[in-house]
Amino acid sequence: MKVIGVIPARYASVRFPGKPLAPLSGRPMILHVLAAARAARLLTRVMVATDDARIAEVVRESGGEALLTSAEAASGTDRLAEAAVRVPADVYVNLQGGEPLMAAENVDLVVETLLASPAREIATLALSGIGETAARDPNVVKVAVAADGRALYFSRAAIPFPRSGVPAFRKHLGLYAYRADALRRLAALPPSPLEKIESLEQLRWLEAGWSIWVGEAVSDSIGVDTPEDLAKAEEIFESRGDRPKQVAGTGPEGACTRNSPRPAPATVQRLGKTAEKEVIR
């Protein structure tokens, strides 16, 4: 089975322009995400899908693979679906480009959650036991889950409301795994009323009758959406004393290590009217 991890990366972020290339622990942030993704056991291939040649070039120089997608993609799922047209696979994993502290174990878990049954078409992860402060933060998305593991609802509000005084909040982590046909059909869905109210794309799928299966994450992750978030991530890297993770087969600046083979130049495909492949050198 071919399982491809795709990291959507947009340069023109409203809250943080140029976010994927922002320096973090001595390297562009997108390379930390790429390294974490490549540490996952169950991904057979990892690539960055971006509408910006600068991001593609940084990824290429590190030994990674980048796909140039259209600037019109409205969401990460749309960018993923666009990439899937050109890169066949059985399963696609949407890896958030703003998650430099993403755990490889969580990536494997979302794939395992999807593959637990051939009837499952979409899977994601949640973290149990978050406190009320996080639950009341509208930037932290919560999910209510049925006994069989299906998502009942996602919200920026604190759900479910602890009327009995015993909180049971679960934080949604923005990792998704999709079967190929499901991804194609999801991308064709129009925006839905609940999606517009909460500004949560996954509500579009629930409203259309899709089941989203939720696995239990092994650890939390910090999303970087603003320069302030980046500063927090930098503090975590410094406190852990981590050396920047390298893309497999490369050295600190994307160069090959002495004992590893030199990676071939990454192919950057422009997804548009032509089917030609470009190799950026």
Describe the residue ranges of each PLM region.
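Conserved alpha/beta core of the MobA/IspD/sugar-nucleotide pyrophosphorylase nucleotidyltransferase superfamily
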Residues: 165-243
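N-terminal glycine-rich phosphate-binding loop and ensuing alpha1 helix
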Residues: 2-49
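Conserved core of the sugar-phosphate nucleotidyltransferase
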Residues: 102-192
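Short, high-confidence coil segments that cap the C-terminus of an alpha-helix
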Residues: 43, 89, 118-120, 210
